[in-house]
Curated annotation (Swiss-Prot):
Superkingdom per UniProt: Bacteria
Active site annotation, chain numbering: 48
UniProt name for this protein: 3-hydroxyacyl-[acyl-carrier-protein] dehydratase FabZ
Gene symbol of the encoding locus: fabZ
GO CC aspect terms: cytoplasm; membrane
NCBIfam families per UniProt: fabZ (TIGR01750), PRK00006.1 (NF000582)
Keyword entries, A-Z: Cytoplasm, Lipid A biosynthesis, Lipid biosynthesis, Lipid metabolism, Lyase
Cellular localisation: Cytoplasm
Biological role stated in the UniProt entry: Involved in unsaturated fatty acids biosynthesis. Catalyzes the dehydration of short chain beta-hydroxyacyl-ACPs and long chain saturated and unsaturated beta-hydroxyacyl-ACPs.
GO molecular function (one): (3R)-hydroxyacyl-[acyl-carrier-protein] dehydratase activity
Known EC number: 4.2.1.59
Length: 142
């Protein structure tokens, strides 16, 4: 388990773009389960959509990427490196994420070589899948 402070030591993101609140399960280089508490005060709800607030799908993907990045960032070889997006594959959005939801972020590292990582990711609320697919990211020198 990682606290928010420990997450901030691994990821360069800060408010309002740090989208992982805590890590509840971590197998370095293999998998991660993390949580994003979706507050009614999130800045993106002001415009998406004021009368019917829904977390934008692209931010769900970003939250998944941040979670997956943590699984790799904790490895000694990646200390001080920055994870950057390299691709998204077969991402499907199945349910909406709304204020008050607890978004569970899961990532399983499928392969990681030559600085590029591919992960199977899933975001869910109360066991219902909100989004799932695969992402790729590269670890580069910051």
């Amino acid at each position: 388990m990682l606290t928010n402070k420990e997450i901030r030591e691994l990821l360069p993101h800060r408010y309002p773009f740090l989208l992982v609140d805590k890590v509840i399960e971590l197998e370095p280089g293999k998998k991660v389960v993390a949580v994003k508490n979706v507050s009614a005060n999130e800045p993106f709800f002001q415009g998406h959509f004021p009368e019917y607030p829904i977390m934008p799908g692209v931010l769900i993907v970003e939250a998944l990427a941040q979670a997956a990045g943590i699984a790799v960032a904790v490895l000694e070889d990646n200390k001080g490196k920055l994870g950057v997006f390299a691709g998204i594959e077969a991402m499907k959005f199945k349910n909406q994420v709304m204020p008050g939801d607890v978004l569970t972020l899961e990532a399983e590292i499928l392969v990681s070589k030559l600085g590029v990582t591919k992960a199977k990711v899933k975001a869910s609320v109360d066991g219902k899948v909100a989004a799932e697919g695969e992402i790729k990211f590269a670890m580069t020198k910051a």
